[in-house]
Amino acid sequence: MDIACGIASLLTVDCISVSRISHPADRFTVGEYIPVVIRSSDKENDRIFVTHRELLGTWEENAAAFSPSETVSGIVRSIEDYGIFVELAPNLAGLAEVKPHVHVGDIASIYIKSIIPARMKIKLVLVDAYPGAALPPPARKYFVDTGKVTHMERWLYSPPGCTKIIETVF
């Protein structure tokens, strides 16, 4: 990633969003302008590490857009023995029970059973999956004004009272 004047930087997959993705193409297109925050630098090896996920908002900010009993669309991001992770927003995913004939990348119709901030959990019911279907690319919502913020010291993704802490210290 070129951050200006030919200065290269590294944006790793885990710094793109809190919701896990398998490849940067799941989130970005070649040549796209991507707002980032400088995470760290390695002057000895002339490397700059950047991050994007902090600009996409906290768990609480993202979860505020959803309500229990609501049916929404999402993208199946991973399938595990214990459930299917469905991305509701770039920084928010929930877990649904395993269902046959569902594949990673499918667009899914999702019923929100419950939202549990203290555990950063969203329980989902997968209503239906649509293999090969495509959602229009969502307009990314940034919770930090990238035109005004010039310095971040700490970013806390976890809601108050949550025992699991996800944070970035710059």
Language model region names:
Residues 1-170:
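Single-stranded RNA-binding regions, centering on S1/OB-family and related RNA-binding modules
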